[in-house]
Amino acid sequence: MTSQRTRERLIQRLCEEGIANQRVLDVIRKTPRHLFVDEALAHRAYEDTALPIGHNQTISQPYMVARMSELLLAAGPLDKVMEIGTGSGYQTAVLSQLVERVFSVERIKGLQDRAKERLVELNLRNVVFRWGDGWEGWPALAPYNGIIVTAVATDVPQALLDQLAPGGRLVIPVGAGEVQQLMLIIREENGFSRHVLGAVRFVPLLNGPIA
């Protein structure tokens, strides 16, 4: 269920779906997604689907992890990325192998604690975690070259725009209920450019930390 052949089938599917960044594909190939889900779901870890991780949250579909990572890296290497929504830690693990430093914010402490353990097990040590409200970001360590949000916001949080460095890229799902769109926002010299990239389905970005 976690064989190399199973992983290669996933990579082939991602390629067929349009993922072209070889670094992203290589990292997803070698990142053990089965370690980021409950043992009872490990046999489904390399399916291209979201899976429940408890607390009414999910581990994102591999295609969406690849797509969002690819969008973030499209302008070149990044040294400082903020992730909103640590969740299982899978997207965090992928990012940590693609950029120099990851600053990950999660509101549910139980999820974040387990994600920390997984990244330590994988010897991924360029990630710093914050337990807090994702709507606020992490202003004390701003600005960031890239920001990735793994839950849907009803609107783009102004705090995240404020924390984006010049030329920085924000990848975020925006909308409510059934109507959600993936957006790429780039901080330009005279403001922000916004690009709508298609329909998606994410859990909501909620306020307030939970112990």
Swiss-Prot record:
Catalysis performed (reactions): [protein]-L-isoaspartate + S-adenosyl-L-methionine = [protein]-L-isoaspartate alpha-methyl ester + S-adenosyl-L-homocysteine
Record's GO cellular component terms: cytoplasm
Coiled-coil segments on the chain, per record: none
Chief place of localization: cytoplasm
Subcellular location: Cytoplasm
Keyword terms of this UniProt record: Cytoplasm, Methyltransferase, S-adenosyl-L-methionine, Transferase
Entry-linked PANTHER family: PROTEIN-L-ISOASPARTATE O-METHYLTRANSFERASE, PROTEIN-L-ISOASPARTATE(D-ASPARTATE) O-METHYLTRANSFERASE
Purpose of the protein: Catalyzes the methyl esterification of L-isoaspartyl residues in peptides and proteins that result from spontaneous decomposition of normal L-aspartyl and L-asparaginyl residues. It plays a role in the repair and/or degradation of damaged proteins.
Name of the protein in question: Protein-L-isoaspartate O-methyltransferase
Source organism of this protein record: Pseudomonas syringae pv. tomato (strain ATCC BAA-871 / DC3000)
